[in-house]
Amino acid sequence: MVAVVQADYSRAEALAAWTRLSDEFIGNCYVSVRPRHAPAWEVVVASAAGSLRLEAFKRAHDHDFLDRLAVAIGNWEQKAQRPDHEIAQMLDQVGDYGLMQGMTNPDKGFMHADILLPLLQARDACAIVVRTEPVFQQLGTAFLVRPDLILTAAHVVMDVDAATGRWASTLKNGLAFHFREKPNQREHPTLAIRPAAVALISHALPHGRPPNLLERSLAAPADTCLDYALIRLAQRVSHLRPVEVVDTAAVKQGKPCWAFGFPGGNALMMDVDLVTDIDPGSGRWLHRANVAAGMSGGCCINHEGQVAGLHEGTLDSEDDAKVKRNRGISIAAIRRDQCRDGKDPLKQVASSPSLEFRDPALVDGWYRAGTALAGEAGAAQWRASVEAALRGRNPDATDSLPAYHPWFARADVEKWIDSAAPDERLSLIHGPPGVGKSFCIHLLRGKLDPYADLVVFNPTQTNDMTWSDATGHAAAANASDYRTAAASVRYRAIDDFLGELRDRSAGGTRTCYVAIDFGPAGRQDRFVGTNWVELIAILAAAGWIRVMLIGLDDYERSVMIDRMESRPETDSVKIAESELAPITAAEFRTYAKHLASARGKPAPKQAEMAKYVDSAVVGVAEPMKMVAAVRAAIELEAALS
């Protein structure tokens, strides 16, 4: 290593020289200095960028090193015992979709690493827009701006008045939006979600004539021809993160602009090039990023990593027909148009239901929970019923499990997450075995950003660790089966933990959630008489932290409530209690109708619905009712698909 550093290279060349070292040599160096609880790789990339790294990336690119580096990092992290699913996510982020290449392309400008994450998020938020009737047709691209709202170009989705041949203010029939089934997925988008019954929330008709004959002038009346459509989905997309919409985001002439979309196929394309012209009056700009038919309606990201607008179309240059220019529509102009009547559609309460999670690991957890609840006597029968619901696939083989898992509404819990009063900072979740208490953590994950907004303590940590060890373990976001013997509590650990939470919540300016799952009834001394009580009170006293406690029994809850009411710093904190019960037959019927609507299918007929309800609710003994309802929903979703 010394010889490499002393060689006559520039700073970037010195780092590029590492590309000639063996993987084993670099790996030993890497592992030797890697912290035991290294932060998430995405956080490192977003926070540790600088000019030296960018120069090194360029040199590494010259040596075709980037793909080899991705594989090498995966090998090193595997040796360091990082979970396989995290390694797969890392490889997706550094080795696919051209993101790293766009980051290092010297001809089109460097992407600062601080905007790598916004680009990854924009990639995941994009959907293919298709029409399924009268014949299947791919129309363009759209992107999530809220879990239940999607933004696209109006000319992609708006119908044409047959009498006049002009654009109509109605959506085309048979629309569907194809999303990824999970973040950072290599596979092409396959999850089709339909528009809601009342779908068109706001829009402005296109600037030009159908099908998309754009007027050549950059300038256009901004109040009537912005060519956008904001559409409500039949269900919320809970497994993907929407892009963050900043009303003032804008492009800058001479700075790079990234364009995303699906060019006539199901593979996402991303390219970057410079902005050449801007016309604020029309809410449009021109850029040179390489785009193609099918990318209309996709999002455009500016040089600061913000959504600057959407891609409208391609124009020939007025002075040279061989020179292509691409036109974008400003998000600032779109947002002004959306809010012109004083109402902001992005801030209105979502009316679309959350219907599903997309996570095979969650399905595996459900199957294993059912096995535990069934006990030794009922395990074989439970396995057979799950295998039948999976249409003969082996439920013990995790690679054969579906991604779909139902999201059954928990109104009180979701209301606390979405709209609790400022002083309602403690939620107590309880109920009999098998009603899905621990599943409420997945509701939190589905609504929040786990990296910034949520810290979870699992039953292993609450039952087998001192709270000081558990806080450090949870803050490191490490989900391994770590165990520790009982040890004396270090009170200073709470200061470290609060500091970690404050960092996650932007200095306490955004709400941070802490979910503590005490699991099934455990030792009598697991909670009462321990420092968990004091820790929870300290967290709830912080005005920017909300705490969800899961699985405490009646006596444990009374102890917690007495502690909160006995101190001046916590006596004003309101406590929300939710006693969960299994899903009812009426709730399952409502869920089934919503799911069918989201899949673009008619609701099951009465006899067919009765079959699913019987499987989910009728004749199912406690404590198997909730896991049986999930099984029935999985069977229903497979039939609808």
From Swiss-Prot:
Keywords: Antiviral defense, Cell inner membrane, Cell membrane, Hydrolase, Membrane, Protease, Serine protease, Transmembrane, Transmembrane helix. InterPro entries: P-loop_NTPase, Peptidase_S1_PA, Peptidase_S1_PA_chymotrypsin. It is a single-pass membrane protein. GO terms for biological process: defense response to virus; proteolysis. Possibly a dedicated protease for substrate gasdermin bGSDM; cleaves the bGSDM precursor, releasing the pore-forming moiety, which integrates into the membrane and triggers cell death. Involved in defense against bacteriophages. When this probable 4 gene operon (bGSDM-FE772_23060-FE772_23065-FE772_23070) is inserted into E.coli it provides nearly 100-fold protection against phages T5 and T6 and about 8-fold against phage T4. The operon without bGSDM no longer protects against phage. It is an enzyme of class 3 (hydrolase). Gene3D superfamilies: Trypsin-like serine proteases. Belongs to the peptidase S1 family. GO terms for cellular component: plasma membrane. It comes from Lysobacter enzymogenes. The keyword Cell wall biogenesis/degradation does not apply. Signal peptide: none annotated. The keyword Membrane applies. It is found in: Cell inner membrane. Its EC number is 3.4.21.-. GO terms for molecular function: serine-type peptidase activity. The chain crosses the membrane at residues 532-552. It comes from the Bacteria. This is Probable serine protease FE772_23065.
